[in-house]
Structures are given as structure tokens and as C-alpha cells.
Regions:
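Active-site SXXK
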Residues: 263, 281-307, 334, 391-395, ...
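Mid-domain, small-residue-enriched loop/turn segments at the edges of structured enzyme/sensor domains
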Residues: 410-441
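Active-site Gly/Thr loop motif
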Residues: 419, 467-522
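Structured C-terminal helix/loop/strand segments within mature extracytoplasmic catalytic/sensor domains
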Residues: 503-550
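Active-site-adjacent helix/loop patches that line small-molecule binding or acyl-intermediate pockets
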Residues: 309-315, 321-415, 439-453
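N-terminal leader/targeting segments and the immediately adjacent pre-domain N-terminus
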Residues: 22-32, 41-45, 94-275, 302-304, ...
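Bacterial N-terminal signal peptides
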Residues: 7-16
């Protein structure tokens, strides 16, 4: 080899060695899911032995208290407990368990424990110019970690946003990122065309209306045409949902859409991988269940009244030095969020739900009673989630029965709701939010109100309670009013105003009744902590649903 050839070869090798490594092509959809438990589930057996009652579940055998249902027991290491027909899973969530005689007469009982799954999924859609964002269906955690692009340097990966940077690494087709709850190994979604990241496929098939299934859950079904709703208009609306581009963190995420009229379910559609058997977190829409439960308890004879004093009821005696304004506080003030506590969910300096949670407060109702007042009860409305919780605890105190048992007895059984979960505080249902129901059961709440408190011929809640609960008693904001833990609003319809009331929760949870049209609409969604969550009730109902109703 000649000397010039050698020099040329050396230069080529040097240039090759100094050239940057080729960046991997990350274009496409990436995703990962972490499951956090709970691990106890399956068949529960409770049986009598010569030494007393025992319970078997998931490999554990423990002693049982009680000689007949209701039984009670605890698993070791806080893995769960059972009391009065409810399974209490770690983290404080209760779900009903039906015990049936298991062939051994009264000495053997069988049930099934189905805890609420705790899992988080993150999607990372990456464009050719390396723009991206984090999509999290369960909690919308991307709103707290706002990123807009991805950078790769060798094995180092950075997700970069205006304020946040997430550092991870890439190797062998895996993007590893530390995100909420743990470390996620995101892989390319192999069949992104059918991924739950999209409403229903990418691109979606042309939507054709199909009536809901008739199930043994108390819902009669019919077609849109049967109840005077335009099928073409609703088909066009559902197609709009299916065609939504998922190119932004703020894109609307609708998980379900249901419509009923004249007491019959006529539309039932699910998106983003959700289905009719999957309970959905209702967030603050649970508050309306709390008001409904209190009304049902009054209807059943529990001696609780709107003018029942809060402090006398909860403490037994009123301290001599108690603020006179607190002495005058009643159940009605809690139900209308006019108690006057220094508690506002929009004020991080107040004693609101997030502050109490972050401080690790265990005695929520006791802590709330000690919060100072900033106004006289009945004077101003402050959106405070611990006030409905305190109202629920008043109910339990007066009834001498837990809200868990009251809800199961007074509402769940007569309304045929079997698959639900109630978040707990103070060892009882948390009236401020976090309950989970299937969409069909969630919708029953508004239908019960439209029925003036009747379900399947039985008066569960008085007509007077329905009227007061759904009345526009206070202005919550410029476009919504508030009753007894129920929102209300007005819509234009055929040249006139009609009134609607609804249970509403963060993320886009809506169970709405429009009594003048004998119409009920329900949405569930995943736009937590994002203003687009109001799109269902503020845009879709007046623009697409009401014009379809004849």
C-alpha cells in the first residue's frame, strides 16, 4: 500500500471513530404499566371448626369473630380485613362481598373477594421531530410532569418541558423512566392501531349504533328511536369522539358515554379500553352519592334532620368556649358547603383535602371540627370536600350504623349495584370523593333523581329531598349552581331554557338528569386537573345531545 493510501485510510478511520453514533428511531407510541396490588383476591371460605370459626383466602387461614354473618377478621401485615360483608383492602377501599351457604349448611360460607386494582399506565407518543408528552389514563399524571420533547445522547434520555425534566436511559429497545410510583420500562406498542391510547383504534372504524345489552342490573333497554332521539345525530357525535386526534396532553379523554330516556338505557359506549364491567373513579361526583345516602337514611327513619347541630352530634357535648358560630352549624350547612370553615379546595393555604392528606391526618372529622371559621355558617359557599365527609360521619353517628352498611342496605341492594368500591377515611366511607362505580351504576344516581326518588316502584328518597338536593341554592361559579352536593345548570333548548342537575367529578365524571326531557346522560373521563374536563356538560350536552332529543 502506498503512503498516500495509508494516510487516506487512517483519516477515514479517524473520522469514523469521531462521528456521532446514529440516533435510534424512537418515532411511534411507547407504553408501560406497573401494577401495585393488591395481591389478596379470589375465593373466601368461612367455616366452623371445633376451635371456632376460620377464614381461608389466598393462602391465609385466620380466626374469625362472630358465630354467623356478619363475620369479621383481619389478615396479618395489613394485607386486608373483612367486616359486615365488606372487604377492606390496603389503602382504605371497601367493596361488598356476598356470602352464600356452601353446601355445609350454616357452618360453611363462600364469597369472592375482588379488590380494586391499583395500576398506572404511561404512554409516550413520539413524533419524527421528537415532540412528545406523557399520557396517564388513571390519574393524568402528565399534567404534573409536563414535557414536550425527548432528547437522546447515547444511552441517556431526557424528557424536557417548560419546568420539568425527566432523566432516563434507552437500551435494547426500552426507554426506562422514573415516573409516578416507580420505574417504567416503556417499550414500543407493537399494535398501536388498536391501543387503548386511542378512543377506539387508529384509524377508527366507521361507527354504527347498537342498542345496549339487557343485563340483570335493573336497567331496561331500548333503542334511540324508541325514545325519540335522533340516531343519525348521535352516530355523528360518537364518531366525533372516535376521530379525536391524540396529539396533545389536553385532548379530551372520554372513557364512557351513556344516555337514558324515559327510564330506559338507549346508548352505552366505551372508549380507551374501558368497558361496562370496569368501575371508574368518580372523584367528587361521589359527593352526590353522600347526599343521596343521607336522604335515603332519612326516608328510612334515621332521626337526622337538616337542622341537626354538627358539634353537639359529633362531640356529644358542646365545649363552653366553642365559637358561637360553630355552635349554630347544622347538617344543612355541610350539605351546601356553607359551614364557613377555612377550607377551600382552590386555596392551598387552607385546611383542604390535599393539605390534610399531605400532612398525614388520620382523624379527618376531628381535625375538621377544629378548623377555624372564616365566615358565619350559611353566609358563603366554599368548595370543601371534608364538609360532605363530616355530614356522612354525622349520619353514621346518629344511625349507629356505618355508611358502608347503610349504603349497601338502602341504595346498593334495591338499585342492584354489586360492583362498587367506597374510599375510606375515619374507618368509614369518605363522603368527599373517590368512590368507584361502573358507568351503568353511576348513571342510576341521576335516574333516581329524575324518578323523584323512586326506583323500581320503591321510594328510596323523598320527593322533597330530591327537590331540595337538586335546587340551585347557591352560585358555585358563573355557570353552575349548587344544592345539597348536586350541581345544576341551564341549557338552551328549542328556544327556551331548561334546567339540568348533575353529579360532577374531576376528570370529567358526570351523571346528569334533565327532568323536563326525562333524560339522563353520563360521562366518565380521564382529564384530571385539566379544564377540558368540563367539555362534557358545557359543550357536548348542549351542542350534540340536546339537539338530538325530539
Amino acid at each position: 500500500m502506498t503512503k498516500p493510501a495509508v494516510v487516506t485510510l487512517v483519516l477515514c478511520l479517524a473520522l469514523a471513530a469521531s462521528a456521532p453514533a446514529q440516533l435510534p428511531d424512537l418515532t411511534g407510541l411507547w407504553g408501560a404499566t406497573l401494577r401495585f396490588g393488591p395481591d389478596i383476591h379470589g375465593t373466601l371460605l368461612i367455616y366452623r371448626t371445633p376451635d371456632g370459626w376460620r377464614a381461608d383466602i389466598a393462602g391465609f387461614t385466620v380466626p374469625v369473630r362472630g358465630n354467623a354473618p356478619p363475620f369479621a377478621f383481619e389478615l396479618p401485615d395489613g394485607k386486608g380485613s373483612f367486616r359486615n360483608g365488606h372487604w377492606i383492602q390496603p389503602g382504605g377501599v371497601a367493596s361488598p362481598v356476598t356470602l352464600v351457604a356452601d353446601g355445609g349448611g350454616p357452618n360453611r360460607w363462600r364469597g369472592t373477594v375482588t379488590p380494586l386494582e391499583n395500576r398506572l399506565t404511561f404512554y409516550l407518543p413520539i413524533t419524527r421531530d421528537l415532540h412528545t408528552y406523557l399520557r396517564n389514563p388513571e390519574r393524568n399524571a402528565g399534567t404534573f410532569t409536563r414535557v414536550s420533547r425527548i432528547e437522546v445522547n447515547g444511552k441517556d434520555v431526557r424528557l424536557i418541558g417548560p419546568r420539568d425534566t425527566v432523566r432516563g436511559h434507552y437500551e435494547d429497545g426500552v426507554i426506562t423512566l422514573p415516573l409516578r410510583g416507580g420505574t417504567y420500562d416503556l417499550t414500543r406498542v407493537s399494535d398501536s392501531a388498536t391501543s387503548p391510547f386511542y378512543p377506539r383504534g387508529n384509524p377508527p372504524a366507521r361507527y354504527r349504533y347498537t342498542p345496549p345489552l339487557q343485563l340483570d342490573d335493573g336497567w331496561p333497554v331500548a333503542t334511540l328511536e324508541d325514545v325519540g332521539i335522533s340516531r343519525p345525530a348521535i352516530e355523528q357525535f360518537v364518531q366525533l369522539i372516535l376521530d379525536m386526534s391524540m396529539d396533545s396532553l389536553n385532548t379530551l379523554q372520554i372513557h364512557s358515554l351513556l344516555i337514558a330516556r324515559h327510564g330506559k338505557l338507549v346508548l352505552e359506549e366505551y372508549f380507551h379500553g374501558f368497558d361496562r364491567n370496569q368501575p371508574h373513579n368518580l372523584r367528587s361526583a361521589s359527593k352526590s352519592w353522600t347526599a343521596t345516602l343521607i336522604g335515603a337514611a332519612m326516608q328510612a327513619g334515621v332521626p337526622l334532620r337538616l337542622d341537626t347541630p354538627v358539634y353537639q352530634t359529633m362531640l356529644g357535648t358542646v365545649p363552653a368556649d366553642l365559637d358561637p358560630r360553630k355552635r349554630a352549624m347544622t347538617l344543612e350547612h355541610l350539605l351546601t358547603m356553607t359551614a364557613g370553615f377555612n377550607c377551600d379546595e382552590d386555596d392551598t393555604t387552607s385546611a383542604n383535602e390535599d393539605v390534610m392528606d399531605n400532612r398525614g391526618i388520620e382523624d379527618w372529622w376531628g381535625y375538621t371540627l377544629k378548623v377555624p371559621l372564616v365566615s358565619t355558617p350559611g353566609e358563603k359557599i366554599f368548595y370543601c370536600s371534608t364538609e360532605p365527609h363530616l355530614a356522612g360521619m354525622m349520619l353514621a353517628k346518629v344511625a349507629r350504623e356505618s355508611q358502608l352498611d347503610l349504603f349497601e342496605r338502602l341504595l346498593a341492594r334495591p338499585m342492584r349495584m354489586r360492583n362498587y368500591y367506597l374510599g375510606l377515611r375515619d374507618d368509614d366511607a369518605y363522603g368527599g370523593g373517590g368512590w368507584a362505580f361502573t358507568s351503568r351504576d353511576f348513571m342510576k344516581m341521576a335516574q333516581l333523581m329524575v324518578n323523584n326518588g323512586r326506583w323500581n316502584g320503591k321510594q328510596l328518597v323523598s320527593e322533597d329531598w330530591v327537590r331540595r338536593s337538586t335546587a340551585p341554592l347557591r352560585n358555585l361559579n358563573a355557570v353552575q349552581q349548587y344544592g345539597f352536593l348536586w350541581n345544576s345548570a341551564e341549557y338552551d333548548y328549542n328556544g327556551r331554557k331548561i334546567r339540568a342537575y348533575f353529579a360532577g367529578g374531576n376528570g370529567g365524571q358526570v351523571s346528569m338528569g334533565i327532568p323536563e326531557l326525562d333524560l339522563v346522560v353520563a360521562f366518565t373521563g380521564g382529564n384530571y386537573n385539566d379544564s377540558v374536563l368540563f367539555t362534557g356538560q358545557r359543550v357536548y350536552v348542549p351542542r350534540y345531545i340536546l339537539p338530538a332529543v325530539q
